[in-house]
Design a protein with these regions (language model features):
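Short, functionally important secondary-structure microenvironments
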Residues: 1-188
Length: 188
């Protein structure tokens, strides 16, 4: 399925890793072997999400944009890029939307992001982590934003190009450095 969606002969590997990933340089899609048996929606979600990276995340700029900004910048970049590529994959493959929603529902129920394990309320997370969960899991989880934070959510949701992603990420990272105590502990 992933090769068909990507429209190229990417390599697909199953590994004992915590989450799915795509190596933009070597064109390898990694799917996790999880401790629990995920349903087909979760598998489809992982494939669709990582195919989004295969189709639209450029190798140039992806890794090099991290070095000067600090270790937390890559997490911010990944959150904003994830929102963009998921929006685009849902446009390209409209049938994937339902499976992605179901997959994120299963991930949230399985505590994939570790909030229950850490005893954390989603609204106690920093802005970037709430944006990450909101753009992935939607409105079902009561994620709250101030009026000012809602503007950042909208900026993230409006990204169309990787250049947009870089621009929004840089501004959001600086905003969070000035307004929050943590920018280096984001969830992927």
């Amino acid at each position: 399925l992933a090769k068909l969606m990507a429209a190229e002969n990417i390599t697909v590997e199953h590994k004992k890793i915590p989450t799915a990933a795509f190596d933009v340089k070597n064109r390898v899609l990694y799917l996790p072997i999880l401790k629990w048996k995920p349903g087909s929606d979760t598998y489809d979600l992982f494939c669709a999400h990582e195919v989004g990276h295969a189709l639209w995340t450029p190798e140039a700029g992806w890794h090099s944009s991290v070095s000067e900004k600090g270790k937390g910048f890559k997490s911010f970049l990944n959150v904003v890029e994830d929102a963009r590529i998921e929006k685009k994959i849902k446009r390209k493959f409209a049938g994937a939307r339902t499976h992605m929603i179901g997959g994120y529902r299963e991930l949230m129920n399985e505590d994939f992001f570790g909030l229950k394990k850490m005893g954390m309320d989603v609204n106690d997370l920093g802005l970037i982590d709430r944006i990450n969960l909101y753009t992935k899991a939607g409105t079902d989880y009561g994620i709250e934003f101030s009026e000012e934070e809602k503007e950042w959510v909208e900026k993230v949701m409006r990204t169309e190009t990787f250049e947009d992603v870089l621009e929004v990420t840089e501004a959001l990272y600086e905003y969070c450095k000035e307004n929050e105590s943590e920018t280096d502990n984001s969830y992927d």
